[in-house]
Amino acid sequence: IFFLNGQYKGILNIRERSNEDNIYTNCDGLEDIDMVENWNELKEGDYDEWQAFVDFYQAHGHSYEEYDKIMDVREFMNVMILNLFFCNLDFPGNNIVWWKPQAEGGRWRVIVKDTDFGLGLYGRSVSYNTIKWLYDPNYDKDNAWANRYEHTRLFRRLMEDERFSREFIDRCAIYMGDFMNFDRTWEIWEPMYNLIRNEYPIHRKLYNE
């Protein structure tokens, strides 16, 4: 609950930044990086490095090992699984930040950002087929800005590799049998819900929501 100069401002959502400050804080003060948001917005560094990566994955036929030399494949896999589980339809064409160290051997990595579009927002069913949505930009005309072909191409190219697709499916099964399921989600969510449940209507009234 947030007050500014004694004036009630409702509930303040504090979250970690998703820009170069995140890297500086979590990577021992690293500053020399390339960073691109939403596939084409240069935030830090050299766009040529990013364009070289895009040119690489636009082509078919690269192996898991080739990809893993220039990007953190398993981290990307985890980020995709996370957003598919959330049914986040404001990703991957939006709310995605790529970065890499400029030092030799630096690989592209992903920062998770803004997943509030998921977990049934706007009444989407738990049976919504996020995989089909990811592969077909015409699957849902009301949610068709973040699944355009240019935004899903990297994932689709990686899924053409047998090793990647097998590991992706295995990880989905393991995660959903362990922590990506209703019971574990509710175990984390319920205390947070109970903490703000009485305050939230007051917050919404303040902002006429």
Regions found by a protein language model. Name each.
Residues K9-L42:
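Conserved structural core of kinase catalytic domains
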Residues I1-F3, Y8, L12, W39-E209:
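Middle-to-C-terminal accessory/interaction subdomains
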